[in-house]
């Protein structure tokens, strides 16, 4: 047994909830069991503001990464442009429980769960689909030798084996080398993989926090709470240009400029904030409302 230190307010449950790492865990009462990928059999649970770790040997740094305690998100407030500094600070302060859980040593599993999350609910469907899939296969590599289009009805799973083969041969070698630009470019070349999937992968499988997927929650936050009026990333432009060299009116370019390495942390906290407060009309609990930092009209 070992205990990993968190920070005041840290919560394993809140940290895993928005993460694609969650797809490799099963929750049994208050204990998370890692049943897929590296460190299978690992058991972790909240212990105050720390995490108790039980089970077989696993590199402590990777366990800390999975638990989201590598870095306190508040440490990245210095990355944020002055005009949004208070937004980041107060948002992270309100959700002190949320860390950034990534899985850089389980990148194949992360790709699967991210691709399956396309146009559907992660918690309501994808977690079940992943479980069903790994009742049939033992490892992600097995997808190279099977045709999922004959095994499942949901279109995401039907497409998975074909997409995974392209990923395995054309993207994975660059992942192993840690080459962000080549991973980004070759992911975008895959049919059915757009900027959202690509940027989610860079964040959750490679821990590249200077970029983040613009999911429905983040999109709501950007346009309604921050009041930013820019266009969404377009695959054809992302294939041609790096953000720094793109002249389009794209929100991703601006977000990277405004938030730097804090962007991935921001998107993770925003997922919880929008889902728990904004979408439920609980503005009276929002710290951004309290300090008049939200652009959304009452």
Report residues per predicted region:
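Intrinsically disordered, low-complexity, charged terminal extensions of DNA damage-control enzymes
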Residues: 1-104, 223, 229, 253, ...
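Alpha-helical ds-nucleic-acid-binding substructure associated with the helix-hairpin-helix region
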Residues: 51-52, 58, 62, 67-189
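Active-site-proximal helix/loop capping residues that flank conserved catalytic or ligand/cofactor
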Residues: 14-17, 22, 114, 158, ...
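Catalytic cores of DNA base-excision repair glycosylases
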Residues: 135-298
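Basic side chains
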Residues: 34, 40-43, 119, 153, ...
């Amino acid at each position: 047994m070992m205990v990993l230190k968190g920070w005041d307010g840290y919560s394993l449950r809140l940290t895993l909830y928005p993460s694609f790492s969650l797809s490799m865990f099963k929750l049994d009462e208050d204990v998370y069991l890692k049943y897929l990928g590296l460190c299978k059999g690992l058991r972790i649970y909240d212990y105050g503001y720390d995490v108790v770790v039980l089970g077989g040997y696993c590199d402590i740094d990777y366990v800390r990464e999975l638990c989201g305690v590598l870095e306190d998100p508040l440490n990245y407030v210095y990355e944020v442009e002055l005009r949004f500094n208070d937004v980041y600070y107060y948002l992270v302060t309100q959700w002190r429980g949320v860390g950034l859980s990534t899985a850089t040593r389980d990148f194949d599993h992360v790709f699967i769960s991210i691709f399956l999350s396309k146009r559907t609910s992660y918690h309501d469907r994808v977690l079940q689909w992943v479980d069903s899939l790994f009742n049939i296969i033992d490892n992600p590599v097995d997808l190279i030798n099977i045709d999922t289009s004959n095994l499942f009805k949901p279109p995401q799973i039907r497409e998975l084996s074909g997409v995974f083969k392209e990923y395995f041969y054309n993207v994975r070698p660059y992942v192993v080398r840690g080459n962000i630009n080549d991973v980004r470019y070759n992911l975008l070349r895959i049919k059915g993989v757009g900027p959202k999937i690509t940027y989610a992968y860079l964040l959750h499988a490679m821990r590249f926090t200077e970029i983040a997927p613009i999911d429905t929650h983040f999109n709501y936050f950007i346009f309604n709470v921050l009041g930013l009026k820019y266009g969404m990333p377009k695959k054809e432009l992302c294939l041609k240009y790096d953000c720094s060299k793109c002249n389009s009116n794209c929100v991703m370019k601006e977000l990277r400029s405004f938030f730097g390495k804090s962007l991935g942390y921001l998107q993770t906290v925003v997922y919880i904030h929008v889902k728990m407060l904004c979408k439920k009309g609980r503005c009276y609990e929002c710290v951004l409302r309290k300090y008049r930092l939200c652009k959304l009209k009452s």
